[in-house]
Amino acid sequence: MSIDETTAGHIQELRRGTVVLACLVRLRRPDYGYALLESLNALGIIVDANTLYPLLRRLEKQGLLTSEWNTEEARPRKFYRTSPAGEALADVLTTDWRRIDGALAGLTTGDDR
């Protein structure tokens, strides 16, 4: 395995957990899958559609998202929204993210007393 493949693998691993948090936070405002994908990518959270759609279904099955179909437009779209359980998880994950971010900031700046 080359260094580039190794690096890519570690980057993918690092991003994997952040996508759940990003979806839960972003879907506090209801949206459909493709718009969510575009929104996350615009923010620099690069997600592939083949990753996002199964994740949305899994989060819905776990009760962390709710969904409903909007058939008012020419093309029906499934809109997702963070559920109360998803809100609670987002709060826990955000707190932990901030803790980890602070710890890593200390490590990378040499302030890791």
Question: PLM features: what roles do these ranges have?
Answer:
Residues R58:
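Alpha-helical DNA-recognition elements
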Residues P76-L93:
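Basic, amphipathic "hinge/linker" alpha-helix immediately C-terminal to the N-terminal HTH DNA-binding motif
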Residues A88-R113:
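Amphipathic alpha-helical dimerization/coiled-coil segments
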Residues Q62-R75, R81:
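Beta-hairpin "wing" of winged helix-turn-helix
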Residues I11-Y53:
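N-terminal helix-turn-helix DNA-binding core of bacterial DNA-binding proteins
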Residues A49, R75-P76:
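Short, aromatic/basic-enriched loop-to-helix "N-cap" motif that marks the start
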Residues M1-Q12:
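Short, Lys/Arg-enriched N-terminal segment that forms or immediately precedes the first helix
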